[in-house]
């Protein structure tokens, strides 16, 4: 049977569609949220995060740009996974941070590290790995306004690392650029964020 260029395109269409669905998940509207929230500029992130992290606290899902309470997020997430696919191999790293310390208007201690997990084997279980910095939920001073809590996932350059060499000595003034330099990582391959406030 002779295949014309048109018939080849028809044969390839289902495969191409599924690939696009995995990689286009954070298209322009999603990158707009990262930009308008100020996270891209405040953390010097790329304009577009190619993947979205699905984060759950029990039955509660983190909705990007949504709001949760400190009580709802007091314990570590029960699930963090990537929606879609990436072009790097394990292991992976996950961080959660608050860039609004002590407040968004006066972030003199940007950022505070709330969680760090290294040497993760699967993008479907980014919460399972070597815990370099134990989880600490949102607990900012009452009256400091809404804080952004940001999850970011990175490739580790195909090598496992020692948590003692990567974890910072303190949570405050966490230098994200220094972190992925030590990790030999590039830009984050996925992220999510929510707001929380102590009334």
Sequence positions of predicted segments:
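N-terminus-centered regions that define maturation/targeting leaders and the start
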Residues: 2-199
């Amino acid at each position: 049977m002779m295949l014309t260029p048109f018939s080849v395109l028809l044969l390839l269409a289902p495969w191409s569609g599924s690939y696009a669905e995995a990689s286009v998940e954070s298209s322009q509207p999603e990158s707009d949220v990262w930009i308008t929230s100020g996270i891209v500029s405040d953390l010097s992130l790329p304009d577009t995060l190619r993947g979205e992290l699905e984060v759950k606290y029990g039955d509660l899902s983190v909705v990007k740009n949504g709001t949760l309470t400190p009580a709802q997020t007091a314990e570590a997430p029960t699930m963090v996974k990537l929606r879609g696919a990436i072009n790097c191999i394990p292991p992976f790293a996950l961080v959660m941070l608050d860039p609004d310390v002590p407040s968004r208007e006066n972030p003199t201690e940007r950022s505070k590290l709330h969680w760090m997990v290294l040497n993760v084997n699967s993008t479907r279980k980014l919460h399972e790995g070597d815990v370099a910095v134990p989880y600490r939920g949102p607990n900012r001073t009452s009256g400091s306004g809404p804080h952004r809590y940001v999850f970011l996932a990175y490739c580790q350059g195909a090598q496992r690392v020692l948590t003692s060499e990567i974890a910072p000595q303190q949570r405050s003034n966490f230098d994200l650029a220094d972190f992925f330099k030590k990790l030999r990582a590039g830009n984050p391959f996925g992220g999510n964020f929510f707001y929380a406030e102590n009334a």
